[in-house]
């Protein structure tokens, strides 16, 4: 479905607010169901103090929809700071109390596989230690992207690949 690098330089790496990737992929890419997984591979050490990815284990069982239409070209700003499609503080608090919060830490080369619908986010990196991860996202060939559910047009192909041909 997509590949991206998340780079958080030392002292100025911006965090990413709590969200479910599937909510965006459903609303803006037209992904019908949460039949995708992400693999985050640490390119640098991921410490508890340099903006490491936080996840709420088990939260993938609950879909938290965003209300309303997605603004045109939302992807131009949402990949830096997501403001549309994020859950309310009440929903986040409820999920955190029910599921807890774990953090992905480890040396470069460590990997975390997680469900497309899991609630996750990261804090700012105010340390001198950069944190970089590559994300590889795999969607089921039986879950081909359709027209977006809440956007006027799909995101560009370089953000959300629409070819559902199986890899051979």
Residue ranges of predicted features:
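Histidine- and/or cysteine-centered catalytic micro-motif in compact active-site loops
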Residues: 21-23, 42-46, 58-60, 68, ...
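Aromatic-acidic/polar surface patches that form glycan- and anion
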Residues: 7, 32, 98, 102-107, ...
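Short, conserved beta-strand element in jelly-roll/cupin
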Residues: 26-48, 84, 105-108, 113, ...
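Conserved double-stranded beta-helix
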Residues: 1-55
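Short edge-strand/loop segments of extracellular domains
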Residues: 8-10, 56-63, 137-144
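Double-stranded beta-helix
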Residues: 48-118
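Non-heme Fe(II)/2-oxoglutarate
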Residues: 68-72, 108-113, 117-168
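Short histidine-centered beta-strand/loop micro-motifs
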Residues: 17-20, 25-30, 104-105, 123-127, ...
């Amino acid at each position: 479905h997509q590949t991206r690098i998340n780079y958080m330089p030392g002292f100025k790496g911006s965090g990413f607010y709590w969200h479910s990737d599937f909510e965006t992929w459903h609303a803006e890419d037209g992904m019908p169901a949460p039949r995708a997984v992400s693999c985050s591979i640490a390119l640098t050490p991921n410490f508890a103090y340099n903006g490491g990815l936080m996840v709420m284990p088990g939260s993938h069982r609950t879909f938290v929809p965003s209300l309303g239409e997605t603004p045109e070209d939302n992807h131009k700003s949402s990949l830096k700071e997501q403001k549309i499609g994020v859950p309310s503080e009440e929903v986040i608090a409820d999920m955190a109390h029910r599921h807890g919060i774990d953090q992905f830490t480890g040396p470069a080369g460590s990997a975390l596989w997680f469900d497309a619908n899991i609630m996750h986010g990261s804090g700012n990196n105010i340390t001198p230690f950069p944190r970089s991860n590559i994300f590889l996202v795999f969607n089921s060939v039986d879950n081909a992207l359709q027209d977006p559910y809440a956007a006027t047009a799909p995101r560009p192909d370089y953000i959300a690949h629409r070819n559902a041909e199986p890899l051979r």
